[in-house]
Amino acid sequence: IIYQIDTALFYDLNGDGCGDIAGIAAKLRYIRRMGATVIWITPFYLTPFLDEGYDVSDHLQVDPRFGKLNDIIAFIEQARELGMQVIIELLIQHTSDAHPWFQQARRNPQSPYRDYYLWSDTDDDDTPPMFPGVEKSIWTWDDEAGQYYRHMFYHHEPDLNLASPAVLKEIENIIIFWLKLGVSGFRLDAASHLTKQAGRGDEKRGL
């Protein structure tokens, strides 16, 4: 039985108005008594939190509103002791525009990070955005970059270029990092968009 937990809403142990990892850990025995064998928690990564944490600015850091890295480690260990596994969200379709990768990409067209994202000199694309009531296009002009960048979701969530070997290596590093800390698996966010984007239509390239 998989029990999904919205990290920000589940249990606020420290009383700051936001649910936290320590709060989930405090309720582990209760969750186990309900019969859960797997806990799936929503994003807890460093984030501006403009999209409920799905706008990640660092995949290897815990956002302070949710706790610290040690809290995650302790939570995973406690869950394992109770016979439960932990799966987390793997967010690799896009990042926050506050992510250091994007900030470096937009500042310098020669930066190796430029290829981490999808850029264009025009916005001539009739692909509808995921949220047409909020976004008019999947392309947004960036003054500093001097180009448009693609975002299937919100303009503050630029799409990663999954055809880039460097991006795939970054994703591999993220996966390895969390597996070493004891997570048992991942829920792949926006999976349908990953296959459409990777290789930009070339099945021999990308994810």
Ranges and model annotations:
Residues I1-L207:
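Active-site and adjacent substrate-binding regions of carbohydrate-active enzymes
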